[in-house]
Regions:
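Peripheral, non-catalytic segments flanking oxidoreductase cores
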Residues: 1-169
Length: 169
């Protein structure tokens, strides 16, 4: 690391012997690290952005058909949908689309927590689901690589550590 004020950079294509000391120092002293050499391609990021821009540029009436519901807390979030808990506060001014890790409706965790269940995928743009799932897979590959490195730093059994991350939200 060149300075205590800079965020260290690791390249996941480097050897573990090269990465581990930099990663450990970054996470213990700064709490952040920049990562390159990961599995999320620039093309995939660009495609994901294009798909999202195409979705959010659709007319409001079309997006509202995908709106989240009390029964399925996934889908389109219109401007002002959420408000702070304080009375009279300004409603949040963002729109979004809530997706989570895909969980089968009959998975027992769905009865315990409303945040688990199947996603509601919009019909347009047609490739949004495929692109999103490819993006998630690339992010998952990167996170698994980082978690393995962190397990080595912590000197814990890698598979046992990774098992703690099997049920993402």
């Amino acid at each position: 690391m060149t300075s205590s004020r800079s965020i260290p950079l690791i390249n996941l294509k480097d050897s573990d012997d090269t990465i581990l000391p930099v990663l450990e120092q970054a996470l213990t002293e700064i709490g952040f690290v920049m990562v390159e050499g990961h599995s999320v391609s620039e093309h995939l990021v660009r495609t994901m952005r294009q798909q999202l821009e195409a979705y959010f540029s659709r007319p409001l009436s079309e997006k509202l058909t995908d709106c989240i519901t009390p029964d399925n807390y996934r889908g389109y979030i219109p401007l002002g949908f959420f408000s702070p808990n304080s009375h009279g506060a300004t409603r949040d001014q963002y729109e979004g689309y809530k997706l989570h890790n895909e969980t089968a409706p009959d998975d027992p965790i769905c009865s315990v927590c409303d945040l688990y269940g199947p996603n509601r995928w919009p019909s347009m743009p047609a490739q949004l689901q495929e692109t999103t799932q490819a993006y998630w897979k690339a992010c998952e590959t990167t996170s698994q690589h980082l978690l393995r490195l962190i397990a080595k730093i912590m000197n814990v059994e890698i598979d046992g550590f990774l098992n703690l991350f099997e049920q993402p939200l």
